[in-house]
Regions:
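Glycine-rich, acidic/polar active-site loops that bind/position phosphate-bearing ligands
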Residues: 107-294, 298-498
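Active-site core of metal-dependent hydrolases
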Residues: 2-108
Length: 498
């Protein structure tokens, strides 16, 4: 049997895979004994060395917005090195939680995200251990710890609501996140002639492009050879560390492109988006390009965003934002949608803040979607369903699918979705998820998802408490939906946001 030369090396390990290599049967790091911890560290060290790793680093996402790392020799790697590091906390952005003389900070291993081998120029390889950063007093100093806390919060409150609705099989709920990354490519020699772009990431002077996006021919157009070579190489660098590219294509503006990474849990998706941005910038240089992640590099052309597709799923496979086919599943779906409506209306300012930076101020609104005003798109069908339940009217469930007949026997009929896709809406329901379209192209998606998780979890908590205390669950479901529409329904806008 010949060895497959095209097989992609697997340069990442999940926590479960690490425990398996170490022959440890525990499920959580807190349950490990000292002997088991030593076996785990030795298994990681051995694996990293077989992959060519000569150093290790605690890889974390400080408030600077990009990953931070310090490389240490792997020869003295131990369980203590694995689980805890000690960087200078006062040297990172910290909102005055640390003064200059208060330097002690800690990093701790985030076992929800895989460890991976990162390859630098010249083939230099480093074992990267995803970690969180916090101060001597336990204050969070990074983007990851608040995200992990919010994921646990929405897990707890989702299960409370599901149990109040009679679900006894689901044990946990995870956030599923897929980020679409937009960017521009320009030749390096042009960048070197433009100090404004080189220093700020955007053009500050100049003339309008003689050919813009008026022809609408760049979007999904054929990718040119040099660009395609760059995109393929970037994808091939990402595959071994577990970043799976779902799609790549031309975007609307000339020289604008997009990568979309496959859905994963919120914390993993956050790490993978950071790795994607870093890889795009590094690989672009090899191909004679500069990758611009600025939100508005050129006046008169579309800017770049990062659509954050967000949903919830149980451990036994229930998609909580998938419209139901019977009363039980439809009640569940509508309550979770109501939690989003409530959160978006009550905390619109927080949502807007999570997508705010200087670059995005140039992009949002004007002649570019979405506007800078928060609204939620549900579509006519979902909006009508909510109103019917609020009015205690019966919903009819049809097993017959709505099909589109295109009038040609050679073309297959397709299922018609329950809603259109409103690309001008900041927060749009799209079949089985919500798409938050305001996110800046250059930032981490951690804060956005932290806020989404938290504001929705508060609504789930309130709904669960009401159902638990109610004499009639069915009547209370109608009351919750009615109250949500009366108190927060003004945030729903199904029209053209332009």
């Amino acid at each position: 049997m010949t060895k497959n030369k095209n097989k992609i090396p697997k340069n990442f390990l999940t926590f479960e895979a690490i425990l398996k290599k170490a022959k440890v049967e525990k499920k959580e790091i807190k349950d490990l004994t000292k002997i088991e911890g030593k076996r785990v560290a030795n298994a990681i060290k051995k694996w990293a060395k077989t992959k060519g790793g000569v150093n290790y680093t605690h890889w974390f996402q400080s408030l600077s917005g990009r990953p931070s790392e310090k490389h240490d020799t792997i020869e003295y790697f131990s369980f203590d090195n694995l689980t805890q590091g000690e960087p200078d906390a006062s040297s990172f952005p910290n909102g005055w939680l640390r003064d200059t003389f208060e330097a002690r900070g800690y990093t701790s291993w985030d076992t929800t995200s895989p460890i991976f081998i990162k390859t630098y120029s010249g083939g230099y390889k480093v074992l990267c251990i995803p970690t969180i950063l916090y101060s001597y007093n336990g204050h969070s100093l990074d983007n990851k710890l608040p995200l992990l806390r919010s994921q646990e919060l929405i897990n707890i409150q989702s299960i409370r609501l599901l149990q109040a609705l009679g679900n006894v099989t689901s044990k946990s709920v995870v956030t599923c996140v897929g980020a679409e990354q937009e960017f521009f490519l320009i030749p390096l020699d042009i960048l070197n002639k433009r100090p404004d772009i080189k220093l700020t990431g955007r053009s500050l002077f100049g003339q309008p492009s003689p050919r813009g996006q008026e022809g609408k021919d760049h979007y999904f157009g054929t990718m040119h050879g040099d660009v395609l070579k760059f995109m393929v190489e970037a994808e091939n660098e990402l595959k071994p560390i577990g970043v799976k590219i779902e799609t790549k294509h031309n975007e609307v503006a000339p020289s604008q492109f997009e990568f979309a990474v496959r859905f994963s849990t919120g914390s993993i998706a956050t790490d993978q988006n950071q790795l994607l941005m870093e890889t795009l910038e590094r690989v672009a240089e090899r191909h004679g390009f500069a990758c611009l992640l600025h939100e508005k590099p050129f006046a008169g052309l579309n800017g770049s965003g990062k659509h954050n597709n967000w949903s919830l799923q149980t451990d036994d496979g229930i998609q909580l934002f998938l419209p139901g086919k019977d009363k039980e599943s439809m009640d569940r779906f509508l309550l979770f949608v109501c939690a989003v409506i409530r959160g978006a209306h009550k905390y619109a300012g927080l949502l807007r803040m999570s997508a705010a930076n200087a670059g995005n101020a140039h992009r949002l609104g004007g002649h570019e979607a979405p506007p800078a005003i928060i609204s939620v798109y549900l579509g006519r069908v979902i909006s009508d369903l909510l109103q019917k339940v609020a009015d205690s009217k019966e919903i009819s469930f049809s097993k017959k699918k709505s099909m589109l007949d295109l009038g040609n026997a050679a073309v297959a009929q397709i299922d018609k979705h329950s809603t259109d896709r409103n690309r001008t809406s900041p927060l749009a329901f799209t079949s089985n998820k919500f798409e938050f379209r305001m996110v800046p192209s250059s930032i981490s998606i951690a804060m956005v998802n932290t806020i989404l998780n938290t504001i929705v979890a508060e609504g789930l908590d309130e709904f669960a408490t009401r159902l638990i205390e109610a004499e009639s669950v069915d009547s209370e479901i109608s009351s919750i939906i009615k109250d949500t529409l009366e108190d927060h329904g003004s945030i729903v806008f199904n029209g053209d946001n332009y």
